[in-house]
Amino acid sequence: MTNAYISGTGFHVPPDVVTNDDLIRRFGVDTTHEWIVQRTGIEQRRFAEAGVGTSDMALEAARSALAQAGLRPQDLDLIDFATLSPAHAFPCSGAYLQRKHGP
């Protein structure tokens, strides 16, 4: 591989939207939506269902990227996959993604 380029991009977000007010109720925290937004800029976030890991979400994103690029998994030389919330310390989430996506 002499040149690398981005053929397609994809993303996946879990369907469960959790607002700051939801968090406050869920965890009984003594704060407000405004306090959280003022300090973090975050108004809502997405939570994955139990048992859904980053490699599962990455698989959906990879499928979208491949469809956008008109490619098949076997056409790829490399998938660049980074996460701050891996499901496992070892092996890396990319190894799980590769296994789920196939050769």
Question: What kind of region is each of these model predictions?
Answer:
Residues S85, A89-R99:
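Short Gly/Thr/Asp-enriched flexible loops that form oxyanion-binding sites at enzyme active sites
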